């Protein structure tokens, strides 16, 4: 695969791209760029092609009863797109697009509110269920996750120029804004 270093958690985009990404943007220090490229490769080890998404919590597969993908992972896609355009493996962009597409299909209810966690069969990739881990209830909108989706799908649209993502993020944003307190 892309990296010999396995990822033990999905939070690599949060931890690395926010800091090293801005560090590289401001200083052009090549050491920062290399950290980002290496981290993107490591994050890619969580991608399961049979599912089409990155696994979020490898240590919790048994707890959730399958391949678990959380909405937070949408934030990581920006680092994958960046790495693919800046000397990394172009396949990283394919991973980001696959993850966004599968998340768009199964992580949202018909009213465009999101689950915190989507659980997939580890062998077939079939969607099993949507649940919450940090939100109020499995059938409630998780506000923080909804915000992750707004940011993540805006990035996916910016990087792909595919209007499907723009249309989708507008609907996700509308339901989020509609549910804010007055």
Model-found features: residue ranges?
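Glycan-recognition and catalytic cores of secretory/periplasmic carbohydrate-active enzymes
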Residues: 1-182
